[in-house]
Amino acid sequence: AGIPVQRGLRPGAHHGIIAADMSYDRADFDYSTEADPLPKGHAGTHIGMFLAWAVLNGLESDHHRAHSAGLLARLRQREITGRQFFEAACQERFAEKDLNEEGNQFVQHYYVDEAGRRGAYFADYKKVLAARLPSFWHVADNWENYEKIAAAISRRYEEWKSPRSRKRSWQFWRSN
């Protein structure tokens, strides 16, 4: 087996860059895209909001509990936003090491698809937060917007956790 392929994402694109560990998304992928007219931080807003939801739902990794305890506390107190946590604690790279096992399983269901491309999260983010904005990148990094997308993420998470949604098609006869 070789080095795994990094699954970096941005809406509408797939990047296959070699890396030592799996990345789900990186803000720097979007620095030379339509996000250019905005400050660079805007490229990490969508990642930070998802990561904040994961932390606030106890899905952060032991790595962050050990190495980012102060930042985790500030995020939980809403002294910083998810994007600010992402920039400071993750060096603008959302990877497997950021979440615990359950968090990574959910990411692989919702944030990325089976091919390692953008998952349903991106459609939810656009529908909930960016539908009336000039672009995906114009979403303001604030707790009001976080609350809106957090409700959508939580719904998807509960659907994913439900035994019925995890049932295989050949198990159609099972009631739960």
Regions found by a protein language model. Give the residues of each.
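Polar/charged low-complexity regulatory segments
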Residues: 35-37, 146-149, 153-157
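Intrinsically disordered or highly flexible coil/loop and linker segments, enriched in small
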Residues: 59-63, 95, 99, 116, ...
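Polybasic, Ser/Thr-rich amphipathic helices
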Residues: 165-176
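Amphipathic protein-protein interaction modules
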Residues: 79-148
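N-terminal amphipathic/basic-hydrophobic helices that include classical n-h-c signal peptides
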Residues: 1-21
